[in-house]
Amino acid sequence: MADEAKQRKTSTAHEKAKAAARAKRLERAKRKPKTKAKSGAKKATAQGGAALSKTTGGHDAARSKAPAKGRNAGRTAFEGQREKQAKAAGKHGAAPSGTVKKQAGARSRSLDEREAAAFAGFGEDAPANRSGLSCPVERACGACQLLGVPYAEQLADKQRRMEELFGPLADEKTAFCPIEGMESPLYYRNKVMSPYAPGRVIPQDRAREDMRRADRGNEAARDGGRTRHDRREKPRREILCGMYAAGTHRIIPTDECLLENQTAKRILLAIRQLMPKFRIEPYDEDALEGFLRHAIVRVGHESGEVLVTLVTNGERFPGSRNFARELVKRCPEITTVVQNVNTQNTNAVLGHEGERALYGPGFILDTLCGLSFRISSHSFYQVNAVQTEVLYRRAVEMACLSGGETVLDAYCGTGTIGLVAANSAADVRVIGVDNVASAIADARENAAHNGVENVEFVTADAGAFMREMAARGEHVDVLLMDPPRAGASEEFLRAVAALKPRRVVYISCNPDTQARDVSVLKDAGYRLTAVRPVDMFPHTAHVENICALEG
């Protein structure tokens, strides 16, 4: 009787559990369409945004996302301008001839969000390839969203986007200059990076491991599981290198890329080939084990010098110099090989735990706008040298320097634009300001290396520095500014209004935040005189833009 009561009790408990499970399934089914659509939209935007971040190369690690739009009644005029400009730019996300539908009730989004959503919307309904260029993994890796669009159409669409974005801020005298495209818009990225990770078990090792497991199982069965086995080597796995798939950390193997320098790509593949010989394990970011995390190759456009940085999960690197010599033997273009240590569980590629040269001087030199620049693993240097020279020369031209002016280079970084300006006219005085001490150290070294004496570099917040200059009654003729993707802060723009430079030349990698800031400067008494886009990253939706303003 006790057993029967126990069985009835157990049966009742099972029935209750089944009923509860059915109720949960029904509840999930009711919510499923709404939840799926919402999460899908978020996923698409996230994937597109990650792909877009990848296309902007040298900027992506140093620049942060724009702050979210203000929605409260008490938001500042500065935040309101951001929303107004996003609405004015409403429909530029799609690739030329592409179709991207806007969801009903969707808020106006920033230019980068629209571009990301446009790319994420590609798939079965992607525009037909009309450029004659193709890549077997272009839809998977997301590095070249517009590869199938003829280059002339890409330029025309980017030009139209800038005219529509800045049109409301212009007057009848504002010059909309034609976009500066590339003559040869392929293989232009002179900084190429690849992660290294373990892939599938090599087939012959898989078969060998299966046989070992079977033998161990048979032995264990014979002695009741008491047999202990010696530790054996793990089966070998493929080594993956290439690009991350859009919005993921899944590596898409690529032996060639139409955007990346071919020498750099060949070196990355040579590293993969040498790793088994030197027993170098690729880093597994899930297990947090392995040794080689990334390799970064920088190629000097004018000099042809090559810097290879190996990012390792630990300092101890047995046979490191032999590895470097063998790599140089296979790729004689290499000038120097550097080991950078990063043991942190982070998405940051380069570490700050130590660095040493395994071969060569540990840096390379390259020429830009007639000046020589020293480039190390941590140096900021634009990834498209051809268009960088165009960008800087146009910016200095728009500054209209005739001699004797005082120029303030805000967000100066390693001093490239300021040095070009200092070298462009007689008796020009240039002051470069940046809050990153290491960048200022590089800027001073670049000035000394080039013998440029009419420039000084200061470690300070640019906005605070300008406010102090205004308080002392000092005068600036021209302000050069190249802020991060988030644009200038409200405090910085107030400082510009207080200092009142006669001319402002604003370089931006994010025209949406640039338009917002230009609108604020316009309210402070400045007039937009010229807009000049530069196509720094062909076959992507990204646009670099220069605005000139006069007060």
Identify the meaning behind each predicted range.
Residues 2-9, 16, 27-31, 35, ...:
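Rossmann-like S-adenosyl-L-methionine
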Residues 2-114:
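Intrinsically disordered, Lys/Arg-rich low-complexity segments
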Residues 71-75, 81, 103-147, 225:
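Terminal, basic amphipathic appendages of nucleotide-handling enzymes
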Residues 129, 133, 139-284, 302:
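Extended interfacial segments that mediate partner engagement and assembly in macromolecular machines
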Residues 183, 289-302:
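Core structural elements
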Residues 190, 304-306, 404-405:
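Nucleotide donor/acceptor-binding cores
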Residues 195-199, 298, 311-313, 550:
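Solvent-exposed residues in well-ordered beta-strands and their adjoining turns
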Residues 297, 303-313, 372-376:
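Short, aliphatic-rich beta-strand segments
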